[in-house]
């Protein structure tokens, strides 16, 4: 009997020990779950995370920072009730690059991220973004033909599709109509040329002893001229370029002639705001922002203004750059399907895209949304000057994407330096082109 009792007690002690061990294990697991509640453990189950910055991508005042995203999340969670979509608030645009880099380095990159133009190349280069070719190609409910072609191209890097476009803005030529009317000059058509552009600038430019100076243009740089005359300068990425082609010579000659009209004065954007300049290239987002009553009072209030396509060079077209805010997917996400469906909702759902017209200053990337009658009403509101939607369509259709390759910002600085040196110097332009061609290509070799 004593032996039996002893065995029972031992069994109870073993069971007690197992229970204690089990409690310890469960406690440790509960701590881990609490610590990882918003991290990897939760994400593997049902949490889809979004990387987004606060404020406007277009650097204008906007009180609807998260409105479109919140509406998209609400619509998504209704359709997929098992998925919870979250994002971190309060990350300003100027801090977003650093914040995203820290997330990548810590292994906690959000499943879906909004991509700043300056970050696109580096994110694709390091493999942080997922190639979307397989997802977009196999999805029967998705077609790239719904987009403006240039907006779709904005999501590519080295020929591969790493992102979907979200909103865009083409560069347009802002026009001080008051100056043109005063000088009895008709507003140019959408297919206007460099000859017309220079002729108007020359006619309106004059100075007086009273200080009532008037200028032709500000902000028209080599990128504007190259694009307008068909120069695809960085078509090979960081590969060899040719700075000596005739179209570049024509572009430099135009810039030199425009500068000479100013008698050495550096015309600025402030001069345009004060009503003293006929033309200034700006993104369409500025047009939308300054159509609002509050900003119209603060800026451009002393004159009547409108916008046009960019003027065409002799060997080019009415071409300008298209700036596009894109969204991409983390290459390490374990929620590929869920992330893709959310990206499609932001990028290709007409209802969500329509909200860009309501709560942002860019344009929807879906062609049928931007070119709808409702879009024109939402863009113009009750203002007298109606926007020429055919002109806007032409501007987007004829737009080009900013080159994307590793080291682009440095390469662009080299061309900036070359153009400034040539325009400020007294040497023959074509001779200087040959010298700078060598310098630019030497630099490109250092980044390859």
Named regions from a protein language model:
Residues 357-417, 421:
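Long, aromatic- and glycine/proline-rich binding clefts that accommodate carbohydrate-like moieties
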Residues 158-166, 171, 195-241, 277-279:
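Extracytoplasmic/periplasmic solute-binding protein
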Residues 117-172, 302-311:
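Hinge/lid segment of periplasmic solute-binding proteins
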Residues 111-114, 278-283, 289-290:
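Paired acidic/hydrophobic, glycine-rich loop segments that form the ligand-binding mouth/hinge
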Residues 52, 297-364, 400:
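Extracytoplasmic/periplasmic substrate-recognition and gating elements
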Residues 201, 237-266, 310:
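Glycine-centered hinge/linker elements that transmit conformational signals in sensory
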Residues 2-122, 314, 417, 426, ...:
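Conserved N-terminal structural module of periplasmic/extracytoplasmic solute-binding proteins
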Residues 133-147, 190, 208-209, 215, ...:
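Short, solvent-exposed loop/beta-turn-alpha elements that line the ligand-binding surface or hinge
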